[in-house]
Amino acid sequence: MRVIAIIDYDAGNLRSVEKALTALGEKPVITSDSHEILSADKVILPGVGSFGDAMGRLHQYELVDVIRQVADQGTPFLGICLGLQLMFESSEESVGVEGLGLLRGTIKKIPDCPGPVSYTHL
């Protein structure tokens, strides 16, 4: 059976991701255990919150190098919302905080615009 690991680092919408995967017939495991993450067939990094706080939690749980290993070994890896942002090198939101560096670039803030502007919320 395929194992899909959802990384738990206290900054994610874990249950909604788990529920969606379960509805698709998958059996995901929510974990912060490095062995479970490294042995998974697929890995998901969800996220809600600020770039700096989330990177701090990944360091606290000693998951930064684990995630980099997952990418290096070619395991399919999906970042959702903040999880995708963390895959980049840095973010303007938290100047001086290094991201995972799996993708080149910096996450930019949406610039302020005069007048009413609507943004799509997904």
Predicted features and spans:
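Conserved small/polar residues in nucleotide/adenosyl-binding loops
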Residues: 120-121
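N-terminal beta1-alpha1 cap of cysteine-dependent amidohydrolase-like domains
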Residues: 1-78, 82, 88, 95, ...
